[in-house]
Amino acid sequence: MERENKPKGFSGFSWGIALFCLPILLWPLALTISPNLLKNPRLSETETTLMSVFLWAYPFGLALIARLAYRLNQHKPPFARGLLGLSAVAFYGMLFYVAGGFH
């Protein structure tokens, strides 16, 4: 009798990718907010542009990094875990920097 090699559930890494990609669900809200940034008198034109670009582009960056980490996890799991952790720290660092108005 042949032993089946099917996963029994989600691995810790799969949960990590799911949590890493969770902010993608807020993308419609980001698209709604981004045109209203122009109305904020405290932001310079450069800050408004950078915030708009961040709000429009972050889901693509998260999805690209998640896909890369998933593919790397098949061959080099420790490296993939490190990449996912470092990417999460970098994303949330940028998020707080942008949300704080670049101060």
Curated annotation (Swiss-Prot):
It comes from the Bacteria. InterPro entries: DUF5389. Signal peptide: none annotated. Its main location: membrane. GO terms for cellular component: plasma membrane. The chain crosses the membrane at residues 12-34, 49-66, 79-101. Keywords: Cell membrane, Membrane, Transmembrane, Transmembrane helix. It is found in: Cell membrane. Disulfide bonds: none annotated. It is a multi-pass membrane protein. This is Uncharacterized protein PM1437.
